[in-house]
Amino acid sequence: MIGWLIYRKEDAIVNYSYIQWFKQEAEKQELCLKLVYDEQLTIQMETNGSSLKIEGHIVDKPDFVIIRKMGTLLQKQFEAMKITTFNNAETAEICNHKVLTYLEMQKIKVSMMPTVFISTVTPPEKPPFNYPFILKSATGHGGTNVYWIDNEDKWKQILKTAITADYIAQSCKDIQTGKDVRVFVIGQQIIAAVLRTNDNDFRANFKLGGKASLFELAPTMEATIKKIINHFNFGMVGIDFLLHNNGNLVFNEIEDVVGSRILSATSNINLLEKYITHIKQTMETVRK
């Protein structure tokens, strides 16, 4: 079977080693994985179907695609051509907009922070919560465009200089700041959980200088995670939780294009080996 691994060029440069690891794990399991740059890919839609072009040349359809970029239109176009995508369009669409994600969590009664959608096009006259609270881009990831709002001046300044239209505001009452738990999930399986902490920032992201260690999930925590997993059709994702002052998990977000740096730094788990196994098993089922 032949699959495409799709990256933007600039991201592929940064993730060169990760891409080579991806391809090696695929080869071990007799899958051919080809790196395709998003900028060189064209999907031409016509009355009777679509064709794929790389650098202007028509190419054969792959059996599956692994999309390592934000967005959903690419997934939707591939799926219209009956090409299996990882993650699929539904997962990508919901997980890449926090309002959509929270609506799904609300459906299945997963504990979350009080959350308000904020449009910078028509911002509210007054802040939605008492200070301090969190304001973050509804489409951001990796800890970017996340702000600690502790006074009126900061509230007004962020809204005035916002680089995206959609934000969410969240009450951080009774939440442990500078600490969160990332749960790595492949398909229907919980692979591992990692506790991230940061003594110098309210954000716990590893890339922002946080520390990490493996985290043992209590049975009640696993039950919460299983509830989320059963609601979706995941390929590979990272589900992030904050910690309530009482120690319980509070849902934060789902990372669609999740990496494995933090898991590699804290364990010997080969995440990509497991992901390729999942993809191969999924494709064998699809082709029956």
Q: What annotation goes with each model-predicted range?
A:
Residues 10-114:
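Conserved N-proximal alpha/beta basic substrate-recognition cap immediately N-terminal to
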Residues 70-72, 91, 196, 242-247:
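Short glycine-enriched loops at secondary-structure junctions
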Residues 147-232:
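Phosphate-binding site of ATP-dependent enzymes
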Residues 260-270:
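Short, flexible active-site recognition loops that position polar ligands and cofactors
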